């Protein structure tokens, strides 16, 4: 346990806190150490070979120097052997789960693991795989390995002499016929394999569990095999990531001598408030990533629930939902103003139409002296209002009494019934209707209204606005304007809708509007965002 002890000394000297999950892994190693063959020689050979031959391939081109924590990970991966049922000495550890905060060099570390296996692993004709959610992510790790063949003096010589070469199938070390290939997360393609080393990258993105399909082939056909699951945590629930976290926290897995879990994460959400605790999730912080970068992300997330979710998931290792309320009470506060700001002013319109069930909203915005002013006409049908529970009906009644919610005595929202109210707003304010944005799925229903107010030969005054993640930029722009008090509204129904509004966070960090509860209507928010997009389009 030489490298465990070195890591513990390093942590003490540098104020790195170990969470309860890593403490459990240490207890497990101590138990295993007393039962199996310790391979200090193999671990040290791997570490020295990596540090002698490999380079950082981003930033300054300099040789890799593994930190004590990373050396300990190598001790867990390579440090123990057992005698199998055939009397053969084999590597003990088949599975490693590394849950580690973003920016901690996981892919670079895995590149060294692959190359160590290809050149020093001694498995003639063996195959190694990197498996990822899609080809782009698989290529990220694959390219880390290939870059080493150009940066490393030793591998460059191998490369030039065609000992280490790139083929259509992947990378090959000719001396041992070992290969490294990339593969996407496809269960059918994974059937029947016989790989010896499997790197499952960013497992938080996986829906179905491909690991067993890959591991089955390795287990049945290889004496020495290892699968490594790496992730920075994520926002996709009920997939492979949740399954792995639950498994590697369990007592059953603690007593499985052929696996190690490295769950670097906070133990609860409250711990994020004390920066000293961040080392639980980012044990290499200060080296990778930099303290300043993580602090900046933390500060940017203040006042933004969606960014807070992402920070806790990707930096602090916590399983988080991919949906979060987006606007804070401070963002949605009312500011009184006079509708005269619209007088003779270019006015942009967004319309979110729902025939029944949700609200229909027509939002008007204009710009004046560096601020954006908004006013929204919100509609429902009386029969829907009458079916509300008492609490909701009291809330809607307040909106009706304030003149902010208009109840129509029809079975569903008829577009023709909106026209008198739009006319009334235009007459009362003297605004100049300029452009309209609308959901393309509703165009045929809205066509008459759109042509009435926004007809032009080229159609420049009308824009079909795609819904979902396509609205990402304008969702974030609306948030920014509200935070900076540059978007002014004075309607309680809009405040309510903004407070109801959640965002779903996509894999690339994009947002789309959603709601957590059916009773939480967000249509005024959507209409306002479309109107804002039209205002911006007129400036470009």
UniProtKB/Swiss-Prot annotation:
Keywords: Endonuclease, Hydrolase, Magnesium, Manganese, Metal-binding, Nuclease, Viral genome packaging, Viral release from host cell
Binding site for Mn(2+) 1: 352, 424
Family matches, as Pfam families: TerL_ATPase (PF03354), TerL_nuclease (PF20441)
Keyword Membrane: no
Enzyme class, spelled out: hydrolase
Signal peptide, first to last residue: none
Record-listed Mn(2+) 2 binding positions: 352, 523
Single GO term (MF): endonuclease activity
This enzyme's EC code(s): 3.1.-.-, 3.6.4.-
Cofactor(s) needed for function: Mn(2+); Mg(2+)
Free-text comment on the cofactor: Binds 2 divalent metal cations per subunit.
Protein's job: The terminase large subunit acts as an ATP driven molecular motor necessary for viral DNA translocation into empty capsids and as an endonuclease that cuts the viral genome to initiate and to end a packaging reaction. The terminase lies at a unique vertex of the procapsid and is composed of two subunits, a small terminase subunit involved in viral DNA recognition (packaging sequence), and a large terminase subunit possessing endonucleolytic and ATPase activities. Both terminase subunits heterooligomerize and are docked on the portal protein to form the packaging machine.
Summary of subunit composition and partner proteins: Interacts with the terminase small subunit; the active complex is probably heterooligomeric.
Family: Belongs to the skunavirus terminase large subunit family.
Entry protein name: Terminase large subunit
